């Protein structure tokens, strides 16, 4: 199965420096990202169909509350059917469910989501909603509590799959104060029952944007890691590089300055979408 990486044409329009750096780094690994021309904003991970394996995809309703609840933001909602118009995609199932692609992390025969999925779909009974998702994704759904400090409610900013039964967990343990301690304890309790956890930890003074390192791109032989400092020499960037080199010791790690994206709530994973060709 061949992996292609797609980006919205808005990445080049609105984030030219990030676009150029990403192109340069991906080219080192023989990858030229392709462009999605019929998109309304840069975060293509959220509105493109979800790959469930064997070249099959699931379509869904992209009407996120952070865009749908205020009519002035409706212009930024990409119509999924237009975005895939020129792509040869096998949509194996189309669910009448509101969700974002960022609230989907495939971990083998399991899918990790946040429970924001319930508030986004009040017309569904919770059990029926879960059953429909499991049918479409052909996987068991593992629910994490929604981090209310993060308005998007995406699970891909919380964990990533490392293969087998191992997952990478963001650095919640470094934020364990007050209510955050209770939140991180709940997360670990849920995940410990299903997976072996590798927790991220960064040295020095912790940046409020340290969440961004989880928002990386993975290819067959590389990890493309967001960086907060222009020359990747910030304290957190250096600590993140070392941490990821230890976790992904069989892959090359490259960094891309992504602060222009990060300040708008996303990073490299959010701004890319993977298409798999059999």
Q: Where on the chain are the PLM-derived regions?
A:
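The feature marks the mature, well-folded catalytic cores of soluble enzymes
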Residues: 1-278
């Amino acid at each position: 199965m061949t992996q292609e990486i797609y980006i919205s044409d808005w990445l080049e329009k609105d984030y030219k420096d990030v676009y150029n750096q990403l192109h340069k780094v991906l080219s080192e690994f023989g990858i030229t990202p392709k462009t999605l021309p019929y998109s309304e904003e840069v975060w293509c991970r959220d509105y493109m169909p979800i790959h469930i394996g064997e070249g099959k995809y699931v379509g869904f309703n992209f009407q996120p509350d952070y865009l749908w609840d205020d009519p002035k933001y409706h212009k930024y909602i990409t119509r999924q059917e237009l975005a895939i118009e020129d792509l040869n995609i096998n949509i194996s199932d189309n669910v009448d469910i509101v969700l974002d692609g960022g609230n989907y992390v495939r971990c083998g025969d399991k899918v990790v989501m946040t429970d924001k999925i319930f508030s986004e779909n009040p017309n569904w009974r919770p059990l029926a909603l879960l059953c429909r998702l499991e049918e479409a994704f052909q996987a068991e759904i593992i629910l994490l509590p929604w981090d209310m400090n993060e308005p998007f409610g995406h699970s891909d900013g919380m964990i990533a799959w490392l293969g087998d039964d191992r997952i990478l967990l963001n650095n919640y343990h470094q934020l364990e104060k007050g209510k955050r301690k209770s939140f991180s304890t709940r997360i670990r309790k849920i995940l410990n029952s299903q997976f072996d956890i590798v927790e991220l930890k960064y040295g020095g003074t912790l940046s409020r944007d340290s969440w961004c390192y989880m928002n990386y791109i993975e290819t067959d032989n590389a990890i493309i890691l967001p960086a907060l400092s222009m020359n990747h020499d910030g304290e957190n960037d250096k600590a993140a590089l070392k941490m990821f080199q230890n976790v992904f010791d069989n892959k090359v790690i490259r960094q891309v300055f992504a602060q222009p994206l990060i300040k708008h709530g996303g990073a490299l994973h959010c701004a890319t979408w993977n298409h798999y060709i059999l």
